[in-house]
Amino acid sequence: MALRRTSDSKVYLPPTPVSRVVRRMNMYTHRIYYYAGSSRLLTLGHPYFPIPKSGSTAEIPKVSAYQYRVFRVHLPDPNKFGLPDPQLYNPETERLVWACVGVEVGRGQPLGVGLSGHPLFNKLDDTENSHLATANADTDNRDNVCVDNKQTQLCIIGCTPPLGEHWGVGTVCKNAQSQVQRGDCPPLELISSVIEDGDMIDTGFGAMDFTALQATKCDVPLDINQSICKYPDYLKMSADTYGNSMFFFLRREQLFARHFFNKAGTIGDSVPVSMYIKGAGQGREPPTTSIYSRTPSGSMVTSDAQLFNKPYWLQRAQGHNNGICWGNQLFVTCVDTTRSTNLTISTVSAQSASATFKPSDYKQFIRHGEEYELQFIFQLCKITLTTDVMAYIHTMNSTILENWNFGLTLPPTASLEDAYRFIKNSATTCQRDAPAQPKEDPFSKLKFWDVDLKEKFSIDLDQFPLGRKFMLQAGIQRRPKLGTKRPASSLSASSSSTTRKKRKLTK
């Protein structure tokens, strides 16, 4: 009897078990909530480029609606916090952490559309309405063009900085057969980096390093032609093992193509002859450039599609970190181009303005201002420091345990140490101990907008707008208020005594 046997060349083993990640459901949560809110946060500057110091003119920063606003919110240490009940946790085996359960990002200023552009934009032909191809690209055909950029509303909440991605110049292999020569297109690489405060967003021209990849300095508007435009790396942040960089995010993007141009310059990748029939002169032989581009437009802005000035409640995060603010800090990343109005300011430059309008008598300036307000609802959570939990936290961020005063106790040294009798004299070497090194901030080299909320926590939720909204949706009743009325017992006693007096009088 013939039997069929499978091939013995391959053996499939079960996959290795995935290490468990500590979730917030494994922690103890108390029904103790705190409100914390910032003051009015304002910034003002030039929307296209920074202005350096020159003579008596002060430095003016670049402030654009197409920049990321990354707020680094500093929270107080709950283990050193004045709690209503000192028996909430055991400091020997437990630690307290904050959990963000509610947030509202307030935006001021009216809705508006801000323009960006370039006085010498690389524009050869209007390819949308062109009636004749122009092959002469040797002359300077740059023109003054302005656009209304892509419309974006974005808000990312996490306890570590968000990550962004953009296309940059890659590296060429040393053993490559053909090296990149001068004038050739360089290899590209997708670069992932931290999004800092002031980084430019994707305005509709792509997420790329325009400084390194566009040598003309006129292919995009002024506000990005010497900048790096980053797009949030949602895929990488969503796949993060710990889920610290993005608890949740709000996003709304809108864009359409408004005008269509082609670029002047020598074509690096010529159109193959097999793809067209040669023309008979009249500007069609040789054909003009085939490097096409369009100007973006964010279209209409309306209050019906606003993501800001609304409360959001975090019930279940998309990652493993369900709102725990490790390190007592929170990162809020915001973008709002629906309030991108640029303020135009004019002043009289001449000693006395003429009766008729003369442009040279006036100076024109442009500025952009932004207004933010941050409000949070935090919940108090308790962590039991088991061996697995401490190993997990140490792998994620070892500085957390150091800030909790957990560390290795070194054994006593067995070597013989020197002890001088007379220390403070010129005959003995200096015995001063080396000063303790300050704790290094892991984000000290990055740029963020610091917001200190260490002294702005309040347990009276009903005294703040966001707190009252949270109490309504959570079903929390307000605390009874103190009044000037007499207690009910005294009222009942007095009323009973008056009735007795009336009865005696009637008798």
From Swiss-Prot:
One of its GO terms (biological process) is endocytosis involved in viral entry into host cell. Residues 477-507 are annotated as: Disordered. GO terms for cellular component: host cell nucleus; T=7 icosahedral viral capsid. Keywords: Capsid protein, Disulfide bond, Host nucleus, Host-virus interaction, Late protein, T=7 icosahedral capsid protein, Viral attachment to host cell, Viral penetration into host cytoplasm, Virion, Virus endocytosis by host, Virus entry into host cell. It comes from the Viruses. It is found in: Virion; Host nucleus. Belongs to the papillomaviridae L1 protein family. Forms an icosahedral capsid with a T=7 symmetry and a 50 nm diameter. The capsid is composed of 72 pentamers linked to each other by disulfide bonds and associated with L2 proteins. Binds to heparan sulfate proteoglycans on cell surface of basal layer keratinocytes to provide initial virion attachment. This binding mediates a conformational change in the virus capsid that facilitates efficient infection. The virion enters the host cell via endocytosis. During virus trafficking, L1 protein dissociates from the viral DNA and the genomic DNA is released to the host nucleus. This is Major capsid protein L1. It comes from Human papillomavirus 69.
